[in-house]
Curated annotation (Swiss-Prot):
Compositional bias per record (Basic and acidic residues), positions renumbered to this chain: 29-49
Composition-biased stretches (Low complexity): 13-28
Protein name: Uncharacterized protein C17orf100
UniProt region (Disordered), positions on chain: 1-118
Gene: C17orf100
Length: 118
């Protein structure tokens, strides 16, 4: 009977589960700003006053002249670059190997003992 039990053994069950997840996030931002400002102020003033006497005795006009010049130049350049790269990978592999043994014969033997006891 031992050979019959060995021959009746059921085939093993094999289960494999594979789960693969890949995620890639890439954010790239670029900003370029150029600002130029120029300011120019020019003031000129000429004033003529009453005549004055020269050493020779002639009358000469007196001239007062004022000149102002202001030049301002400003340049600003801003450049910003940002880069964010994120990559993640997840891989899960599960293998299940289950071999079933033939049904045990202890239960019918117990029933026979009950019948004998009655």
């Amino acid at each position: 009977m031992a050979s019959a039990r060995g021959a009746k053994q059921s085939s093993p069950r094999v289960g494999t589960t594979r789960y693969t997840e890949t995620s890639t996030v890439r954010v790239e931002t670029s900003s370029h700003r150029v600002e130029t400002s120029s300011r120019r102020v020019e003031t000129s003033q000429r004033r003529s006053e009453g005549p004055s006497l020269s050493p020779s005795g002639k009358r000469l006009p007196r001239i007062l002249e004022a000149s102002s010049r202001h030049v301002e130049s400003s340049s600003q350049r801003t450049e910003t670059t940002s880069r964010h790269v994120r990559a993640s990978s997840l891989r899960v592999e599960t293998s299940l190997h289950c071999a079933e043994s033939p049904t045990p014969r202890a239960k019918p033997a117990a029933r026979q003992n009950e019948k004998t006891a009655r």
